[in-house]
Amino acid sequence: MERTPNPNNQPVELNRTSLYLGLLLVFVLGILFSSYFFN
């Protein structure tokens, strides 16, 4: 898989947003699982 550097693309920002989305997803899933366990 070869990736050509694109000046219009910002891989750092994309990685940061994907990282934040992943953390948010894990956080929401943790809250849901904790609510299921506590109830």
From Swiss-Prot:
One of the components of the core complex of photosystem II (PSII). PSII is a light-driven water:plastoquinone oxidoreductase that uses light energy to abstract electrons from H(2)O, generating O(2) and a proton gradient subsequently used for ATP formation. It consists of a core antenna complex that captures photons, and an electron transfer chain that converts photonic excitation into a charge separation. This subunit is found at the monomer-monomer interface and is required for correct PSII assembly and/or dimerization. The keyword Metal-binding does not apply. The keyword Iron-sulfur does not apply. It comes from the Bacteria. It is found in: Cellular thylakoid membrane. One of its GO terms (biological process) is photosynthesis. This is Photosystem II reaction center protein L. Its main location: membrane. PSII is composed of 1 copy each of membrane proteins PsbA, PsbB, PsbC, PsbD, PsbE, PsbF, PsbH, PsbI, PsbJ, PsbK, PsbL, PsbM, PsbT, PsbX, PsbY, PsbZ, Psb30/Ycf12, peripheral proteins PsbO, CyanoQ (PsbQ), PsbU, PsbV and a large number of cofactors. It forms dimeric complexes. It is a single-pass membrane protein. Keywords: Membrane, Photosynthesis, Photosystem II, Reaction center, Thylakoid, Transmembrane, Transmembrane helix. Disulfide bonds: none annotated. GO terms for cellular component: photosystem II reaction center; plasma membrane-derived thylakoid membrane. The chain crosses the membrane at residues 18-38. Belongs to the PsbL family.
